Amino acid sequence: MKNIAIIGASGYTGAQITSLINAEANLSIQGLYVSESSLDKGKPLSELYPAYSHISLCLNPLSEDAKQTIVATADAVVLATDHAVSLHLAAWFYQQGLAVFDLSGAYRFSDVAQYPKWYGFTHEYPQVLADAVYGLAEWNSDQIAATKMIAVPGCYPTASLIALKPLSHLLTDVLPVINAVSGVTGAGRKAQLHTSFCEVSLTPYGVLAHRHQPEIATQLGQEVIFTPHLGNFKRGILATITVKLKPGTTLSDIQQAYQCYDSAELVTVKQNQFPKVDDVVQTPHCHLGWKFDEQTGYLVVASAIDNLMKGAASQALQCIKIHFGESVK
């Protein structure tokens, strides 16, 4: 039985992974934590999320004493905290010998030069960063098992990279174009005008300036054009990706490329049949659908995930299971 501490448990992602870990026979929750300044400290999780009424745990303030208790009694810590908060917490817990599963972007880039531009801070822990592994579960399982510092990918990169990485050897210099729509939960739980009921519509945001663009490009090994959109639904992501493939590429080449997922428990691939968000919401699955025009050499692949599950919490759980040698289903 592995004991997991969850920090940032009051947010959508933190609450979601609390629910997932609570349902695992071989994992237990060491405790739920929020910042000492949080208005939610001391509250039962079920007060914030009545759907989790079966979880009788309260949100504890993350004091210095609480941190020492975590080190003494937990095997791993999940960080569902802001990037700048995770930067320090992840390094501290890692240096104490715990396995760290960080859901922020604080350890996703291996290059320290990326952080001032995309996250607004200078990375203070280059050695910890050097040890970090990008937790794209279907692709980096050996590294996830071998390290104690796992940077869980962003939601848009997860949807995009699962679709594109099998094709990396078939891509040309023409940049892949990724148009992706996310549910409102992707913007977090904090009240904001643009995510309020009367304001939500369908609109692009972060155009040519979203931090997930370089994350996707770094992991793919090729620049991309990425445009995220905020949709008028609660949860889920649909990424529709257009790519130019090398001259002479055939349907058989693409079919063979996607055979890499034949044994993947959580990825489904279909040709000439496209996924919809409703089919993956509240699940840890990624559904891919693709179609290829041999005359023009263009392929369109669509990728659907739940942004809070495969795009965050359930992928973190995958990484936890891989790291501790549990089967992933």
UniProtKB/Swiss-Prot annotation:
Protein keywords: Amino-acid biosynthesis, Arginine biosynthesis, Cytoplasm, NADP, Oxidoreductase
Keyword NADP: yes
GO MF term set: N-acetyl-gamma-glutamyl-phosphate reductase activity; NAD binding; NADP+ binding
Subcellular location: Cytoplasm
This enzyme's EC code(s): 1.2.1.38
GO BP annotations, alphabetical order: L-arginine biosynthetic process
Gene3D superfamilies reported in the protein's UniProt record: Dihydrodipicolinate Reductase, domain 2, NAD(P)-binding Rossmann-like Domain
Entry keyword Oxidoreductase: yes
Enzyme class, spelled out: oxidoreductase
Alphabetical list of InterPro entries matching this protein: AGPR_AS (IPR023013), AGPR_type-1 (IPR000706), NAD(P)-bd_dom_sf (IPR036291), NAGSA_dehydrogenase (IPR050085), Semialdehyde_DH_NAD-bd (IPR000534)
Main location: cytoplasm
Pathway: Amino-acid biosynthesis; L-arginine biosynthesis; N(2)-acetyl-L-ornithine from L-glutamate: step 3/4
GO cellular component: cytoplasm
Catalytic activity: N-acetyl-L-glutamate 5-semialdehyde + phosphate + NADP(+) = N-acetyl-L-glutamyl 5-phosphate + NADPH + H(+)
Domain of life: Bacteria
Catalytic machinery residues: C155
NCBIfam families from the UniProt entry: argC
Similarity section: Belongs to the NAGSA dehydrogenase family. Type 1 subfamily.
Role noted for this protein: Catalyzes the NADPH-dependent reduction of N-acetyl-5-glutamyl phosphate to yield N-acetyl-L-glutamate 5-semialdehyde.
Protein name: N-acetyl-gamma-glutamyl-phosphate reductase
Native organism: Shewanella pealeana (strain ATCC 700345 / ANG-SQ1)
